[in-house]
């Protein structure tokens, strides 16, 4: 227990993040299955819309703050950044431990918020006046706000740690332009966290005082404006979605270049600039989430254009990945299957994003299932596919064990069918006008909702199969004899698994 509770070792802390993220992911998945069960047939299943919206809200918060971010930034980030930099550990190892241990209390607060009063049925955006005292009396929303505060502090500390580590602890020979793309993606992610989370903290703190201390930041009766909250929230919320996908970009770059048998990713400097551009542009497009609140036409025109510009650096990344794959004799290993699935499905999600960027079109599609389909393509098939690819790719390094390849391929096929069956029909529902965040719908929408629910059941079976595959690997203890990877990235020069202290002597990189 002492080793895990007080650990200052980036590998142990990374492992804790993985376990925590997997556990939270199971909770979040259970909530999503409840959502799909409710929508699997017309009529009610679990009760009124309040409980339904509590489930939807908790599903979003858990998947974002307690599954994707801990696994990508906490798990892969902690494990790989020091190894790829040739650094003995993170810059602030004890703060690293604290970043992790802020998360279980944060998750507990969120779960408790669902259990007191009527729960926080606000949606993950927590818009007032629905989230204000007038519509959500009781402590639920307050507890959810405190949960976000803790998760936010955790992420800010982690971000400071990663930025400091990369600035100060690069090994001799690793200049910024030669730094691995995954490390770049984590640094840019950390910068985004550092700049956006304080704004969220301000917004939810003002909401807290509106609810409890009689201020009126968001209450028109006292001269406030609920639209101010939306601006503040989305100034955080839009960078947040890039925070969720950028580490995935970094992992996919590594996996594609290694599986292609290439020395490096095509256009790696361009890839770095593309990620920097995405990070910068992510901060100046937030109001595209607010096309329906009545902004001036010139404001809408700006946010439409700026949003579409993000497609350019994203396109650079997609085509560079395709160029990296070009001309290779691929063996379809499980990791490359996930990476190829990522490139294809993330592109589909990106295309629906360009559709939604048009303010005039978005007036019709806003708050319909078209939006749900869009962001689940980039999250459930972008972020999650990247996590799967990365986990399978680096599992032999992390554990020194092998997974069952045949099963992993079957698992990929099951998941691929499941997620597409779940989310592709939601585009049709959205175009037909089915609104989000309702527990019931007119009968005309039944067919595609049934298809979607069947898809979610298939995905659930896939996830359970994945946990079985990991269990089987840990029980069988098939040791890795040597890493099959080309050593295009220095983490593969480690033992499998790496020693507790990887670089007691600092490496010198010459190339």
Curated annotation (Swiss-Prot):
Topology within the bilayer: Multi-pass membrane protein
Role description: Component of the cytochrome c oxidase, the last enzyme in the mitochondrial electron transport chain which drives oxidative phosphorylation. The respiratory chain contains 3 multisubunit complexes succinate dehydrogenase (complex II, CII), ubiquinol-cytochrome c oxidoreductase (cytochrome b-c1 complex, complex III, CIII) and cytochrome c oxidase (complex IV, CIV), that cooperate to transfer electrons derived from NADH and succinate to molecular oxygen, creating an electrochemical gradient over the inner membrane that drives transmembrane transport and the ATP synthase.
Binding locations of Ca(2+): 38, 43
Binding site for Cu cation: 238, 288-289
UniProt binding sites for Mg(2+): 366-367
Cofactor annotation: heme; Cu cation
Subcellular location: Mitochondrion inner membrane
Quaternary structure, from the entry: Component of the cytochrome c oxidase (complex IV, CIV), a multisubunit enzyme composed of a catalytic core of 3 subunits and several supernumerary subunits. The complex exists as a monomer or a dimer and forms supercomplexes (SCs) in the inner mitochondrial membrane with ubiquinol-cytochrome c oxidoreductase (cytochrome b-c1 complex, complex III, CIII).
Documented effect of changing residue 411 to Q: In strain: G52 and BG1
Organism of origin: Drosophila mauritiana (Fruit fly)
Protein known as: Cytochrome c oxidase subunit 1
Gene responsible for this protein: mt:CoI
Top EC category: translocase
Species lineage: Eukaryota, Metazoa, Ecdysozoa, Arthropoda, Hexapoda
């Amino acid at each position: 227990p002492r080793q895990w509770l007080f650990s200052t070792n980036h590998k142990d802390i990374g492992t804790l993040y993985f376990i925590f993220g997997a556990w939270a992911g199971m909770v979040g998945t259970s909530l999503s299955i409840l959502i799909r069960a409710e929508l699997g047939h017309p009529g009610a299943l679990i009760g009124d819309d309040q409980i339904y919206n509590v489930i939807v809200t908790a599903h979003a918060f858990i998947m974002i703050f307690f599954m994707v971010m801990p696994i990508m930034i906490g798990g892969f980030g902690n494990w790989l950044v020091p190894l790829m930099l040739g650094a003995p550990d993170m810059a602030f190892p004890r703060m690293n431990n604290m970043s992790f241990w802020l998360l279980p209390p944060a998750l507990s607060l969120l779960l408790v918020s669902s259990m007191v009063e009527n729960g926080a049925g606000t949606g993950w955006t927590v818009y007032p006046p629905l989230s204000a005292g007038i519509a959500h009396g009781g402590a639920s929303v307050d507890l959810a706000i405190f949960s976000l505060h803790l998760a936010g502090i955790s992420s800010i500390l982690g971000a400071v740690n990663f930025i400091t580590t990369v600035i100060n602890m690069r090994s001799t020979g690793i200049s910024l332009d030669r730094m691995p793309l995954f490390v770049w993606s984590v640094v840019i992610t950390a910068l985004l966290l550092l700049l956006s989370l304080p704004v969220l903290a301000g917004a939810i703190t003002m909401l807290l005082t509106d609810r409890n201390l009689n201020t009126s930041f968001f209450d028109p009766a006292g001269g406030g404006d609920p639209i101010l909250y939306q601006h503040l929230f989305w100034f955080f919320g839009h960078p947040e979605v890039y925070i969720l996908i950028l580490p995935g970009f970094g992992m996919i770059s590594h996996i594609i270049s290694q599986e292609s048998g290439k020395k490096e990713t095509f256009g790696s400097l361009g890839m770095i600039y593309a990620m920097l551009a995405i990070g910068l542009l992510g901060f100046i497009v937030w109001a595209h989430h607010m096309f329906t609140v009545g902004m001036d036409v010139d404001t809408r025109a700006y946010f439409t254009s700026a949003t579409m510009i993000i497609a350019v650096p994203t396109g650079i990344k997609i085509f560079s990945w395709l160029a990296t794959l070009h001309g290779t004799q691929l063996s379809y290993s499980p990791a490359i299957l996930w990476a190829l699935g990522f490139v294809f499905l993330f592109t589909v999600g990106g295309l629906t994003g360009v559709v939604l960027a048009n303010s005039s079109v978005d007036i019709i599609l806003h708050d319909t299932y078209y939006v749900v389909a869009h962001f689940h393509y980039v999250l459930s098939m972008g972020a999650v596919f990247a996590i799967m690819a990365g986990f399978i790719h680096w599992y032999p390094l992390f554990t020194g064990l092998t997974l069952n390849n045949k099963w992993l391929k079957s698992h990929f096929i099951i998941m691929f069918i499941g997620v597409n069956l779940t989310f592709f029909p939601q585009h049709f529902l959205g175009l037909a006008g089915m609104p989000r965040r309702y527990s019931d719908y007119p009968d005309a929408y039944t067919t595609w909702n049934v298809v979607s629910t069947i898809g979610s059941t298939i995905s659930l079976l896939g996830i359970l199969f994945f946990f079985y595959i990991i269990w089987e690997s840990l029980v069988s203890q098939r040791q890795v004899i040597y890493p099959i990877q080309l050593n295009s990235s220095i983490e593969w020069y480690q033992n499998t698994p790496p020693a507790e202290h990887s670089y007691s002597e600092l490496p010198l990189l010459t190339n």
